[in-house]
């Protein structure tokens, strides 16, 4: 959806050069479009092929020419075609009508569900909120997921990096967060698929429908809007689709005054697309071939994701690390903006511990006594040190067995195993697979539960009672059930 001003204000230019996804357009003297304006080209080429594409102005070249980047394929585009300056940046639909729908970078629905029932649109380029409008007091965003809330709590209006390979539960974790923010916080979510596989986008959409996150029968009951610019799209679309998703999220925050979750999968592809566009525009590459404007590009997106006095956008961003090199400029620049990292470990998934969040590798700037309080901080650190000691003892156990450990170490191992099991939790969105009802665990219950394990109050309960339950009351009930079954 591109801004279409009144005919009198439209300036018409002519396409003079096409180089892949980049085109040069000549305009009348004194009537050049502004940088970031959308240009619309609708024409028939000599072969009779209908051309309809939108491009975004990136450079003013001189000689009344501008250079623009196309948001869709330029196949069939020829010199001499008319390009119209829309007089405004690309705009996308916003509001409740976007929920349950799938959009492309231009805000056009691509789910074959008909037009979007809203006239409200917003430009994808805008300034970050003013400092005076920001909520500066750090506030923990409760997710209801024990391992996250205790060991790597999210900041409301913060940015979280989600790291994990294939098949360790990223999608299910994302679905559970979307479900929990809708039920417990009355918030909505926006999912931005940036440069990932089309198949994954389709699978995600089908899984959302299956788990009830998208209500196919009544879209107004859906909890998420989706915005996709997949791997096969030109770099312009992949570079801007993150902003399209962010613009939809900003409307829910600023106009509806809601708490919003924004998912970006994958933030690395956003940087990668910017690098491609930069090269096409003829800019001199910087370190490792990235664009010289890397810091600015990432900053423009990240600084708009924040908590204001009216509402918040909490962002969870999947981060692909090229060749597992954390010093690569793309992930290194992204890390500078993150408040927390959630690392999913294959070893935990292999043990059947879900969510497979690594309790020792996941971090958060919120885990400090001045923010979460002394009790939460001490409990989290005690849990981590117990798990760390268990990790150190595993080599000895593998070689000599448990019997060779000291009494104290055996107790540590016993408690660590219970902690590891208690960090697992049944999810609402996985009910159809597990047959177990999902659990949302309040932070106070989480802290109390882990304190009881650490203090030794539950040493007599079997390890299995701690697996895939919510709070400690459920552990005790499960222990009774296991006892009666023997």
UniProtKB/Swiss-Prot annotation:
It is found in: Cellular thylakoid membrane. InterPro entries: AAA+_ATPase, ATP-synt_VA_C, ATP_synth_F1_bsu, ATPase_a/bsu_AS, ATPase_alpha/beta_chains, ATPase_F1/V1/A1_a/bsu_N, ATPase_F1/V1/A1_a/bsu_N_sf, ATPase_F1/V1/A1_a/bsu_nucl-bd. Keywords: ATP synthesis, ATP-binding, CF(1), Hydrogen ion transport, Ion transport, Membrane, Nucleotide-binding, Thylakoid, Translocase, Transport. Signal peptide: none annotated. GO terms for cellular component: plasma membrane-derived thylakoid membrane; proton-transporting ATP synthase complex. Its EC number is 7.1.2.2. It is an enzyme of class 7 (translocase). It is a peripheral membrane protein. CDD domains: ATP-synt_F1_beta_C (cd18110), ATP-synt_F1_beta_N (cd18115), F1-ATPase_beta_CD (cd01133). Its main location: membrane. GO terms for molecular function: ATP binding; ATP hydrolysis activity; proton-transporting ATP synthase activity, rotational mechanism. ATP binds at residues 164-171. It catalyses: ATP + H2O + 4 H(+)(in) = ADP + phosphate + 5 H(+)(out). The keyword Ribosomal protein does not apply. The keyword Ion transport applies. HAMAP family: ATP_synth_beta_bact. Produces ATP from ADP in the presence of a proton gradient across the membrane. The catalytic sites are hosted primarily by the beta subunits. F-type ATPases have 2 components, CF(1) - the catalytic core - and CF(0) - the membrane proton channel. CF(1) has five subunits: alpha(3), beta(3), gamma(1), delta(1), epsilon(1). CF(0) has four main subunits: a(1), b(1), b'(1) and c(9-12). Belongs to the ATPase alpha/beta chains family. This is ATP synthase subunit beta. It comes from Prochlorococcus marinus (strain MIT 9312).
């Amino acid at each position: 959806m591109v801004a279409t001003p009144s005919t009198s204000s439209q300036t018409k230019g002519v396409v003079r050069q096409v180089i892949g996804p980049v085109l040069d357009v000549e305009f009348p003297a004194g009537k050049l479009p502004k940088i970031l304006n959308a240009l619309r080209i609708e024409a028939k080429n000599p072969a009779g092929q209908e051309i309809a594409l939108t491009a975004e102005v990136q450079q003013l070249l001189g000689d009344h020419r501008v250079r623009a980047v196309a948001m869709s394929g330029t196949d069939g585009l020829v010199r001499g075609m008319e390009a119209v300056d829309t007089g405004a940046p690309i705009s996308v639909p916003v509001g409740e009508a976007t929920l349950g729908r799938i959009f492309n970078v231009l805000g056009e629905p691509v789910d074959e569900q008909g037009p979007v029932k809203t006239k409200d649109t917003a430009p994808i380029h805008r300034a970050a909120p003013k400092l005076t409008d920001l909520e500066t007091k750090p506030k923990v965003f409760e997710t209801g997921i024990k391992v996250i809330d205790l060991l790597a709590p999210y900041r409301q209006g913060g940015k979280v990096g989600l790291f994990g390979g294939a098949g360790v539960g990223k999608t299910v974790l994302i679905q559970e967060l979307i479900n929990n923010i809708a039920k417990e916080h009355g918030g909505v979510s926006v999912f931005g698929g940036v440069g990932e596989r089309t198949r994954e986008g389709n699978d995600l959409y089908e899984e959302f429908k299956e788990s009830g996150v998208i209500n196919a029968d009544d879209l107004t009951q859906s909890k998420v809007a989706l915005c996709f610019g997949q791997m096969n799209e030109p770099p312009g679309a992949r570079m801007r689709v993150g902003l399209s998703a962010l613009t939809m999220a900003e409307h829910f925050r600023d106009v509806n005054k809601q708490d919003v979750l924004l998912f970006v999968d994958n933030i690395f592809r956003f940087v990668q697309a910017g690098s491609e566009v930069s090269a096409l525009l003829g800019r001199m590459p910087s370190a490792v071939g990235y664009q010289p404007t890397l810091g600015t590009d990432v900053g423009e997106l990240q600084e708009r994701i924040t908590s204001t006095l009216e509402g918040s956008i909490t962002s969870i961003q999947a981060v692909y690390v090229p060749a597992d090199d954390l010093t690569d400029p793309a992930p290194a620049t992204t890390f500078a903006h993150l408040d927390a990292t959630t690392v999913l470990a294959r070893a935990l998934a292999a043990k059947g511990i879900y969510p497979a969040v690594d309790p020792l590798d996941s971090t958060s700037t919120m885990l400090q006594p001045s923010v979460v309080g002394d009790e939460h901080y001490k409990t989290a650190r005690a849990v981590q040190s117990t798990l760390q000691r268990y990790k150190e003892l595993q080599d000895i156990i593998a070689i000599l067995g448990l019997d060779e450990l000291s009494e104290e170490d055996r107790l540590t191992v016993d408690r660590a195993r219970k902690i590891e099991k208690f960090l697992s939790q049944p999810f609402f969105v996985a009910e159809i697979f597990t047959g177990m009802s999902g659990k949302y665990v309040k932070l106070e219950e989480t802290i109390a539960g882990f304190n009881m394990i650490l203090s030794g109050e539950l040493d007599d309960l079997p390890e299995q009672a701690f697996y895939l339950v919510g709070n400690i009351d459920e552990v005790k009930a499960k222990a009774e059930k296991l006892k009666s079954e023997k």
